[in-house]
A protein has these predicted regions:
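Short helix/strand-capping turn motifs
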Residues: 1-110, 125-126
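Short linear, low-complexity motifs centered on an aromatic residue
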Residues: 115-127
Length: 127
């Protein structure tokens, strides 16, 4: 979900990198959302919008300004954590690895969070 609309070129590059991380036959639950109604969406407001979603990936201001364009992964599985969700950053190139494993429940959010690099970005297990 795009929440920063300051740079259309960076958005297009980031989305292309995300899509490229998937193989053609990959089973996924990912739906890119590019709607200016979500510009500057806060995590509190996010909680009001998502129902029955266990995770959300955001292209926020950091995504648009950091040269690596790390997306913000938000674990929304615990409704009681409204606004205080567990989060991690991930490189667009590992989106399929993270999203598909969460979608299929092969791995949980904490497993990925436990393996982020020192800068808080998950870049994959096989680097």
């Amino acid at each position: 979900m795009r929440t920063d609309f300051t740079d259309d070129t960076t958005w297009a590059q980031t989305l292309a990198a995300v899509i490229a991380s998937y193989r053609e036959d990959t089973i996924t639950g990912l739906t890119p959302v590019n709607d200016a109604a979500f510009d500057r969406l806060t995590l509190d407001a996010l909680g009001e919008l998502i129902h029955d979603q266990t995770y959300v990936f955001l292209a926020d201001a950091t995504t648009m300004t950091d040269p690596e364009h790390p997306l913000l992964a938000v674990d929304t599985s615990d409704e009681s954590s409204h606004g205080n969700y567990p989060m991690l950053r991930l490189a667009p190139s590992v989106m399929a690895e993270v999203e598909v494993n969460l979608f299929l429940a092969n791995t949980d959010f904490a497993d990925f969070a436990d393996t982020v690099d020192d800068d808080g970005v998950y870049r994959g297990l096989n680097r």
